[in-house]
Amino acid sequence: MRHSLAAIPAAFLSGLAVAALADDAHTIIQNGRAFHPVEVTINHGETLDFSNQDEFIHQIYVDTPGLNYDSAEQPPGETFHIAFPDAGTFSVRCHIHPKMLLTVHVK
């Protein structure tokens, strides 16, 4: 019994560490050939998770001074992650659906 009680604080602290890491990520939903939301503000060093909840493939790219990113094709149900290490304003688009636009403000 003493052994399992000792594990409780460690498990609790481990859970807190995971929760703290999760706070650094923000989820962007791809649905209806659009990003949701269409604009987001984050801190430098944070990550955006792009979750494809559409019925078709997307291909995310960022081509802004300070950050270049081009994903592979992103099938429905998959998630890609983009880190934004520096401050600035970035445009995220989809190669396949050029009207898709997300503006990312990084502080």
List each model region and its residues.
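Extracytoplasmic copper-binding redox domains, predominantly the cupredoxin/blue-copper superfamily
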Residues: 2-5, 17-107
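Sec-dependent N-terminal signal peptides
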Residues: 6-13
